[in-house]
Amino acid sequence: MRPTRAEVNLAHLRHNLRVLERGLTGATKPQIWGVLKADAYGHGAPAVARTLERAGIPGLCVALLEEAIELRDAGIRLPILVMGGYYGPRRDGFEEIIARDLVPVVYDAGQIERLASVVRLEQRGRVGVHLKVDTGMGRLGAASSEIEAVLATLAKHPEVKLDGLMTHLACADADDLGVTIEQMRLFGEIEQRAKSFGLTPRVRHASNSAAMLRLPAALLDIVRPGVALFGISPCAGLAPDLKPVIRVRSEIVALRTIAKGDRIGYGHTWQASRESVVATVPMGYADGLSRQLSNRGAALVRGQRAPIAGAVSMDLTMLDVTDVPGARLGDEVVFLGTQDGPLGRGTISAEEIAGLTGTIAWEVLTSISRRVPRFYREP
């Protein structure tokens, strides 16, 4: 078996939950529902969900019905909100929702009609839904021009109960919070329109990680942190006590000394400027190591940075370890996270990788592929 793996520190996950809980102030603290979409941001949703459930979190959120089913099959009993709102054009998606006791998000009249017909057919009494409204994101959610028809459809189907009202904030991590404040104003207007139809949601929610850390007015009844649970602050300087949860490591499987002027890798994009020692490591872009790190990124060996030499391949990556004294076969190589070694202590963060590859830390985490096995630590 190759030595490449992702180590998930569940103690850090619990720590981050407590940090976020402590940051919620006021007479009525909102509930934290953890967002575990995309396999819990690459950390492994079942194990993360079990840890959060034991830690007392009151609910979870996912994007897809398939993600919710995976958690139910793993034995998770918490309420699970299916935020994507796509259940297929027929009724079978809603049948799964009801059978597995999930909380559906809806945003158009057709969804409500289909769900109501399933509830009547299965004689389930009432099923609670969360209505998503679009206040400025422009993706999913009932738009202002549609909201009257959607609310009227809900009002005429008593078997579908408006349990929650939600929206998604587009710019909560921006320097200027003007857009977010306007979204919250529109959300308040829609809540009042719902009440005019006799619909009063039990809970309201809008805050993602950035909003819950920056805008107390957006906290409402539930907050939905995602990336912050995994130790990534959505805004520089916010929540400095968060701890990264995942660490990606491998080992040196080959060492080679090459002459000055030799070229290596696909396209021969790296040329030795001196006699050099090159280490080969069994991790590549198929594992989530971005090809954009070719000749730009680095890894940690013996606690010291070693530059990536040449193009990142599908399964393998080469490092220039000429300046890493004592590098040898079997040495640990860390591509993401912290390493303590005989030459010092080093850290490569998801934010650093994102900066080098022109993306965001969210993508760095979710790009770690499933062929990289997750190992869970309880220090």
Swiss-Prot record:
<feature type="active site" description="Proton acceptor; specific for D-alanine">
    <location>
        <position position="37"/>
    </location>
</feature>
<dbReference type="InterPro" id="IPR011079">
    <property type="entry name" value="Ala_racemase_C"/>
</dbReference>
<dbReference type="GO" id="GO:0030170">
    <property type="term" value="F:pyridoxal phosphate binding"/>
</dbReference>
<feature type="modified residue" description="N6-(pyridoxal phosphate)lysine">
    <location>
        <position position="37"/>
    </location>
</feature>
<feature type="binding site">
    <location>
        <position position="314"/>
    </location>
    <ligand>
        <name>substrate</name>
    </ligand>
</feature>
<dbReference type="InterPro" id="IPR009006">
    <property type="entry name" value="Ala_racemase/Decarboxylase_C"/>
</dbReference>
<dbReference type="GO" id="GO:0030632">
    <property type="term" value="P:D-alanine biosynthetic process"/>
</dbReference>
<dbReference type="InterPro" id="IPR000821">
    <property type="entry name" value="Ala_racemase"/>
</dbReference>
<keyword id="KW-0413">Isomerase</keyword>
<dbReference type="InterPro" id="IPR001608">
    <property type="entry name" value="Ala_racemase_N"/>
</dbReference>
<comment type="pathway">
    <text>Amino-acid biosynthesis; D-alanine biosynthesis; D-alanine from L-alanine: step 1/1.</text>
</comment>
<dbReference type="GO" id="GO:0008784">
    <property type="term" value="F:alanine racemase activity"/>
</dbReference>
<feature type="binding site">
    <location>
        <position position="139"/>
    </location>
    <ligand>
        <name>substrate</name>
    </ligand>
</feature>
<feature type="active site" description="Proton acceptor; specific for L-alanine">
    <location>
        <position position="266"/>
    </location>
</feature>
<comment type="function">
    <text>Catalyzes the interconversion of L-alanine and D-alanine. May also act on other amino acids.</text>
</comment>
<comment type="similarity">
    <text>Belongs to the alanine racemase family.</text>
</comment>
<protein>
    <recommendedName>
        <fullName>Alanine racemase</fullName>
        <ecNumber>5.1.1.1</ecNumber>
    </recommendedName>
</protein>
<keyword id="KW-0663">Pyridoxal phosphate</keyword>
<dbReference type="GO" id="GO:0005829">
    <property type="term" value="C:cytosol"/>
</dbReference>
<dbReference type="InterPro" id="IPR020622">
    <property type="entry name" value="Ala_racemase_pyridoxalP-BS"/>
</dbReference>
<dbReference type="Pfam" id="PF01168">
    <property type="entry name" value="Ala_racemase_N"/>
</dbReference>
<dbReference type="Pfam" id="PF00842">
    <property type="entry name" value="Ala_racemase_C"/>
</dbReference>
<dbReference type="InterPro" id="IPR029066">
    <property type="entry name" value="PLP-binding_barrel"/>
</dbReference>
